[in-house]
C-alpha cells in the first residue's frame, strides 16, 4: 500500500479505484487490481 499526501492523481490511475473513509483516514481501494491501493498520510 502506498502512502501519499494527495490521492487525487492516484484515484484516476484506474477506473475501479474507490475512495473510502475509515477511522479518519482516506483510502483508495481497488478490488480488481489491488496494487493500486493507497492511504493518505
Curated annotation (Swiss-Prot):
SUPFAM superfamilies: Ribosomal protein L36. It holds the Pfam family Ribosomal_L36. One of its GO terms (cellular component) is ribonucleoprotein complex. GO terms for biological process: translation. Keywords: Ribonucleoprotein, Ribosomal protein. InterPro entries: Ribosomal_bL36, Ribosomal_bL36_sp, Ribosomal_L36_bact. GO terms for molecular function: structural constituent of ribosome. It comes from the Bacteria. Belongs to the bacterial ribosomal protein bL36 family. HAMAP family: Ribosomal_bL36. This is Large ribosomal subunit protein bL36. The gene is rpmJ.
Amino acid at each position: 500500500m502506498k502512502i501519499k499526501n494527495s490521492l487525487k492523481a492516484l484515484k484516476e490511475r484506474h477506473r475501479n479505484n474507490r475512495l473510502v473513509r475509515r477511522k479518519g483516514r482516506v483510502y483508495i481501494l481497488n478490488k480488481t487490481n489491488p496494487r493500486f491501493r493507497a492511504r493518505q498520510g
